[in-house]
Amino acid sequence: MLKATIDAEIFREAIEAISALVPECRLHTAEDGITTRAVDTANVAMIAFTLKKEAFDTFKATKSEIGVDISKMKNIFNMGGKGDLISLELADNAQKMAVSVHGYHYSITLLDTNTIRKDPNSPTINLPGKVVISGEDLNNAIKAAAVISDKIAMGINPKDQTFYMVAEGDTDHIQREFGKDELKSLSPVEARSLFSLDYLRDMGKVMSKATEVEVCLGIDHPVRFSFDIAGGNGHVEYLLAPRIEAD
């Protein structure tokens, strides 16, 4: 059972965070909020998402698992404007969820959870390099790199105490270094890995709105991005596998 109302902007932000990686997912409702954990079809990127009940104007739910077409929900919530409230209502064992926004009333058929990939386990990975940077700065560097390449190297230089992002195209090169004065914090541990910009572009759009993004790195290891949404009443973690660098 779920019965809730929430600001349209807050819920749109939440749905966009999920839709950056997957078109559908299993949403878990509970008395304290909504969560999901999902991996993309290529097993390259994963999201762990939490939206606390405090993010909602009203919230009442029991423990359940529902299959949601995130792409469809994203299009529906685009109907909402600033200051609009979204109403969500789902009865026990129901196959449709009632959604109301900006005077529009939808009856959305839920997906069969048996057709959706099971929630992935949270991997235990040691990522000693840690940087906290503004989401806007991070996204700007990603966008700049995407102009000339489809991949980007991220790393930490402990000697210079900098966080750097480097991209190489066929004939072009771009590098951006962030010193300690441009970062919220930095753990000066050597780290460097290469990542696909196809994934980072979509992640970057979501992270651009975050005041702070924690970036955790290793050497030829995945990268973990952690940041808050919904005024601190929600949290998102992205985990992205590295690309193998050619010799």
From Swiss-Prot:
Pfam family, one: PCNA_N
UniProt GO BP: leading strand elongation; regulation of DNA replication
Keyword terms: DNA replication, DNA-binding
Source species, domain of life: Archaea
Matching InterPro entries: DNA_clamp_sf (IPR046938), Pr_cel_nuc_antig (IPR000730), Pr_cel_nuc_antig_N (IPR022648)
Position of the signal peptide: none
Molecular function (Gene Ontology), one example: DNA binding
Function: Sliding clamp subunit that acts as a moving platform for DNA processing. Responsible for tethering the catalytic subunit of DNA polymerase and other proteins to DNA during high-speed replication.
Family: Belongs to the PCNA family.
Quaternary structure note: Homotrimer. The subunits circularize to form a toroid; DNA passes through its center. Replication factor C (RFC) is required to load the toroid on the DNA.
NCBIfam families reported in the protein's UniProt record: PRK01115.1-5
Record's protein name: DNA polymerase sliding clamp
Organism, as annotated: Methanoregula boonei (strain DSM 21154 / JCM 14090 / 6A8)
